[in-house]
Amino acid sequence: MTAALEPIILEAARSYRLPVALIHALIKAESNFVPWAVSPKGAMGLMQLMPGTATFLGVTDPFCPRQNILAGCRYFRLLLDFFCDSIPLALAAYNAGYQRVIDAGHRIPPIKETQEFVTQVLERFYASIKRGRRQISL
């Protein structure tokens, strides 16, 4: 992670009431902090926004770290609100799509990639909490 991203992450954490450590863990899992990352499925930028999601969120440049992080965190907050502040379900929805979580009965869908993603992000998030990284509570 570069220090240049930290003010953006702090802004997003405050704006969307997200723990800083969770944003770090999410970006690490999605793009390994590479702003120009593009997935085989077409997800773009630090928080790997799909084109339709980026458009919905008003992103004009998905490779702009500020736009990408703020939009990704806004979307994650929407998912958290929808799934009653369940971080695991919001992570699953972020990865697989919210409809798949609904179709799975409001559980993590039986998709290996999604299950591994949720586990990876949560492990990083909880490890960071154990290390005492600064938090902004939900």
Task: List each model region and its residues.
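Catalytic glycan-binding domains that act on GlcNAc-containing polysaccharides
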Residues: 1-138
